[in-house]
């Protein structure tokens, strides 16, 4: 059994997924873009941001729909997780996972998936800023309810609101459907945005012309694709994206990986009373990792990423 013990090994798994996505999209005329922190890393570091450990892609909605419908990996190693088809899937966007790995997301009741690359659809939004704000506010409310449904932690200021939301007679699937119907706008406008996360703020919007074409960009020694208007997108969304953030804000999204076998993971799940959850983050930096390490009461037996044959 090969252990994933450092960030370099995790990145190797992720870039393997990215390579296969690039292969498939190139062969099938599907447009994709490096985005978010992945794009900042490509521009500023020609690879990962040094402390980053995830990969994000954008696809125009039509390309995204084609991708989740058609994507196949001839070797059977990778598969796409489609929010419309996966049972108990908590996200409103797709992920491509390496099926040889297991990643335990303890924040959401121990949900288990493989190491992944996130794929976000980019949708048309209203050209009117006031209307966009109204949609964003309604969408954020649905996301609050949805997060209360899936999370063990109360992220709201009011405990009463948290439990009221959690007890509403709606499923996560129903909420995902409501969010998609709200954000998917088929008629073209001059403005687009990633609408599938709790954000974006209005500054996350961009001119539709910015994603009408793509350009090559280097990432970890290989060439991939990003949107033609990537400089405007980065400036609008992140400000001075070439400037490094303060040291105390350089936190990874996934907590540093350790590994064990799938058998051990299943044993952990069955004997969860013997375990406690431990947050791995520097206090005071405002960072809330999406994945928490499930830690055994006995020191030295932590689990996050589990490779298996």
Model-assigned labels for residue ranges:
Residues 2-26, 68-127, 147, 151, ...:
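Conserved catalytic core of two-metal-ion nucleotidyltransferases
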Residues 22-55, 59, 64, 209, ...:
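Active-site nucleotide-donor binding segment shared across nucleotidyl transfer reactions
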Residues 49, 53, 66, 232-233, ...:
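Generic secondary-structure boundary signal with a strong preference for alpha-helix termini
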Residues 128-134:
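A short secondary-structure junction signal
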Residues 138-154:
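Short, cationic low-complexity segments
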Residues 160-162, 252, 260, 284, ...:
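Intrinsic disorder/low-complexity segments
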Residues 273-301, 307-309:
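Positively charged N-terminal leader segments that act as targeting/secretion signals
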């Amino acid at each position: 059994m090969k252990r994933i013990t450092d960030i370099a090994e995790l990145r190797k798994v992720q870039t393997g997924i990215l390579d296969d996505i690039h292969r498939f999209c190139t062969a099938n005329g599907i447009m994709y873009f490096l985005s978010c922190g992945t794009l900042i890393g490509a521009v500023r570091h020609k690879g990962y941001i040094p402390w980053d450990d995830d990969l994000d892609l954008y696809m125009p909605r039509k390309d995204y729909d084609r991708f989740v419908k058609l994507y196949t990996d001839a070797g059977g190693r990778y598969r796409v997780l489609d929010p419309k088809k996966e049972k108990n899937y908590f996200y409103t966007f797709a992920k491509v996972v390496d099926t040889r790995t297991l990643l335990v997301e303890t924040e959401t009741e121990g949900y288990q998936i493989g190491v992944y690359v996130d794929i976000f659809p980019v949708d048309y939004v209203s050209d009117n800023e006031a209307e966009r704000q109204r949609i964003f506010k309604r969408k954020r409310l649905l996301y609050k309810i949805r997060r209360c449904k899936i999370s063990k932690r109360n992220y709201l200021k009011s405990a009463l609101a948290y439990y009221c939301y959690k007890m509403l007679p709606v499923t996560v699937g129903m909420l995902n459907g409501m969010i998609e119907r709200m954000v998917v706008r088929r008629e073209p406008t001059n403005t687009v945005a990633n609408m599938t996360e709790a954000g974006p703020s209005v500054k996350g919007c961009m001119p539709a012309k910015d994603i009408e074409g793509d350009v090559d960009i280097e990432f970890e020694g290989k060439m991939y694709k990003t949107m033609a208007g990537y400089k405007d997108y980065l400036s609008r969304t992140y400000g001075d994206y070439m400037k490094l953030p303060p040291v105390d804000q350089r936190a990874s999204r996934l907590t540093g990986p350790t590994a064990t076998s799938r058998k051990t993971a299943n044993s952990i799940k069955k004997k969860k009373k013997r375990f406690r959850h431990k947050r791995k983050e520097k206090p005071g930096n405002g960072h809330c990792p999406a994945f928490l390490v499930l830690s055994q009461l006995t020191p030295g037996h932590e689990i996050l990423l589990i490779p298996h044959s």
